[in-house]
């Protein structure tokens, strides 16, 4: 099914998983990753709306789970970033723990978009997030954000290495795609994956 993402609108912000809408109605895809990994920017690029989600250069700015509705019953979930360095260890891991709870409990979750800064890939909490998703058979699509920050040659080499490392690490194929809001890398692939999941 092909969705019209440019009409996506803000639905609600909630502080916890138990506050989310009834999971028996509709389908969801969640955007997760470290603080400042580009989750909000990716949603804005996907929907062709520069201000749909608040983008901040300050890590840890988002502290609520933000829901956006593509069409009735079709939702994108923007989770706060995990691992913000200036937080205590407990707070650094807090949103990762919430995401793991969400993965286990949310029956209408169709897939996980994991944002990873291509310059700092597969950090500890990213690895644990992927493992949690795979353990409950939730597909993962990894977007290597900020790909415009490195040269094209380095981009190709780095992308291949990340794909190889993830295959060895998780013993399965994880979809990986370079992504850049500035140079429009990966937006078409993101739409394709979402349309496949949300049908």
Curated annotation (Swiss-Prot):
Keyword GTP-binding set for record: yes
A GO molecular function held by the record: GTP binding
Alphabetic keyword roster: Cell cycle, Cell division, GTP-binding, Magnesium, Metal-binding, Nucleotide-binding, Septation
Pfam families on file: MMR_HSR1
Cellular component, GO, one term: cytosol
Binding annotation for Mg(2+): 40, 62
Keyword Hydrolase in record: no
GO biological process, alphabetically ordered: division septum assembly
CDD domains attached to this UniProt entry: YihA_EngB
PROSITE patterns: G_ENGB
Domain EngB-type G: 25-199
InterPro entries: G_ENGB_dom, GTP-bd, GTP-bd_ribosome_bio_YsxC, P-loop_NTPase
Superkingdom of the source species: Bacteria
HAMAP family from the UniProt entry: GTPase_EngB (MF_00321)
Family: Belongs to the TRAFAC class TrmE-Era-EngA-EngB-Septin-like GTPase superfamily. EngB GTPase family.
Job description of the protein: Necessary for normal cell division and for the maintenance of normal septation.
UniProt name for this protein: Probable GTP-binding protein EngB
């Amino acid at each position: 099914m092909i969705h019209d993402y440019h009409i996506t609108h803000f639905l609600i912000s909630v502080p916890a998983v138990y506050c989310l809408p009834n999971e028996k109605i509709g389908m969801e895809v969640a955007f997760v990753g470290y603080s400042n990994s580009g989750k909000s920017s990716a949603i804005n690029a996907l929907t062709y709306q520069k201000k749909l989600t608040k983008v901040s250069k300050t890590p840890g700015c988002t502290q609520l789970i933000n829901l956006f509705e593509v069409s009735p019953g079709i939702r994108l979930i923007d989770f706060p970033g995990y691992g913000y360095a200036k937080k205590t260890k407990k707070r650094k891991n807090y949103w990762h723990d919430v995401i793991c709870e969400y993965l286990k409990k949310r029956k209408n979750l169709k897939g996980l978009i994991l944002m990873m800064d291509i310059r700092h890939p597969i950090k500890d909490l990213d690895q644990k997030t992927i493992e949690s998703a795979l353990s409950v058979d939730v597909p993962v699509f990894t977007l290597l954000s900020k790909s415009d920050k490195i040269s094209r040659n380095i981009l190709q080499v780095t992308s291949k290495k990340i794909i190889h490392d993830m295959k060895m690490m998780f013993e399965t194929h994880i979809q990986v795609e370079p992504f850049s809001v500035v140079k429009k890398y990966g937006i078409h692939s993101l739409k394709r994956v979402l349309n496949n999941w949300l049908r």
